[in-house]
């Protein structure tokens, strides 16, 4: 029964991520149609990430007070409306406002979905189940940009947002029908003291710093890269293809993440941090389609390993009944990075070229590697 519930849950994740993936990477290009500069794109990415930063602990709190599955349904509903209202955009300011609400909706989806994985999976199977969840998520994001690129090229942005809304709506109905009635969350046990959490955060500080650097790179890829690719003449269809290739690499890494545990967390995270760094360098130095494709696949492959391995380390340092806190802390650290990353890039483009800005931002891949060495040695295995 539990396996059936997990399978249905993963289907809803796939459909929802398909709908979101169809449009999310094209919003920066859509903003450029209203005259958005790279500073504007940085601001859009920063506002979106700011919304995602304030969301995790709120969602974790709600998930602790009510059935997590209802919070999941609410998150899907928020995403549907945030996507639909993009149809009404008439300026860059409109997009900035709507991206704030879109950030809340998308982060609510990610956080509650990750909490549900920890609810439905035994502790010893969390890396494997996080990998399966990642496969469902990335399959949608893999196929979505391809469909979104074709729809945009053929029918325009308005129809893209409408179709995306319908797909997300389907996942909402699936969640209501398949998950609500039979969902069994983890039993609430006495929580650890506040001072206990402070000790955990101090012990994991290098790891959280690494996650922040990872978030900076994630914000750069999702908020800035589409506009960068568009500015050097890459079409909407090919931008969709680049993100689908990014998704293929993530998918492979998610599906095989549990195999890397035999090498140890420190070695694994150090290696993938360097892979991400090389991917960023490739994008910065060679602004042509094929090098961009290679760079995106390197980054995607690294990202696919970072998520399940890191969240497993974080969750093992929290009491089992406080998995929501572990997930929320992980997501908040990522979103702090995602908030400052696009803003830093936007400011760099004012004083130097776009390519050099990417080159300078690649240093965060090195920071990830340095924090990987320190962060995993202090974490409890």
Language model: regions and residue ranges:
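Structural signature of the two symmetry-related core transmembrane helices
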Residues: 70-84, 165, 267-281
């Amino acid at each position: 029964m539990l396996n059936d519930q997990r399978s249905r849950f993963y289907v809803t994740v796939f459909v929802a991520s398909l709908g979101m993936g169809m449009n999310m990477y094209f919003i920066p290009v859509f903003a450029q149609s209203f005259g958005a500069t790279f500073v504007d794109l940085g601001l859009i990415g920063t506002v979106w990430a700011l919304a995602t930063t304030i969301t995790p602990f709120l969602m974790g709190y709600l998930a602790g007070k009510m059935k997590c599955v209802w919070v999941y349904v609410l998150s899907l509903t928020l995403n549907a409306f945030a996507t639909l209202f993009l149809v009404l955009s008439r300026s860059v300011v409109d997009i900035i406002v709507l991206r704030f609400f879109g950030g809340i909706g998308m982060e609510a989806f990610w956080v509650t979905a990750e909490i549900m994985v920890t609810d439905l999976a035994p502790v010893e199977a969390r890396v494997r189940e996080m990998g399966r969840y990642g496969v469902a998520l990335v399959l949608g994001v893999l196929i979505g940009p391809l469909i979104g690129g074709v729809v945009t090229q053929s029918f325009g942005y308005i129809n893209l947002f409408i179709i995306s809304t319908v797909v997300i709506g389907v996942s909402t109905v699936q969640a209501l029908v398949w998950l609500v009635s039979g969902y069994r969350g983890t039993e609430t046990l006495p929580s650890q003291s506040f001072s206990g959490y402070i000790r955990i955060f101090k012990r994991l500080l290098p790891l959280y710093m690494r996650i922040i650097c990872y978030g900076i790179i994630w914000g750069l890829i999702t908020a800035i890269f589409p506009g960068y690719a568009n500015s050097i003449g890459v079409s909407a269809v090919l931008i969709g293809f680049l993100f689908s290739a990014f998704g293929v690499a993530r998918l492979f890494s998610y599906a095989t993440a549990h195999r890397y545990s035999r090498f140890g967390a420190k070695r694994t995270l150090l290696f993938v941090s360097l892979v991400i760094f090389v991917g960023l360098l490739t994008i910065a130095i060679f602004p042509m389609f094929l090098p961009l494709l290679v760079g995106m696949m390197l980054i995607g492959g690294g990202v696919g390993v970072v998520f399940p391995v890191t969240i497993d380390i974080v969750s093992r340092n929290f009491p089992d009944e406080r998995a929501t806190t572990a997930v929320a802390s992980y997501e908040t650290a990522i979103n702090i990075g995602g908030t400052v990353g696009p803003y830093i890039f936007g400011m760099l483009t004012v004083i130097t070229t776009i390519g050099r800005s990417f080159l300078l931002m690649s240093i965060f891949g090195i920071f990830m590697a340095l924090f990987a060495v320190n962060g995993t040695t202090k974490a409890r295995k």
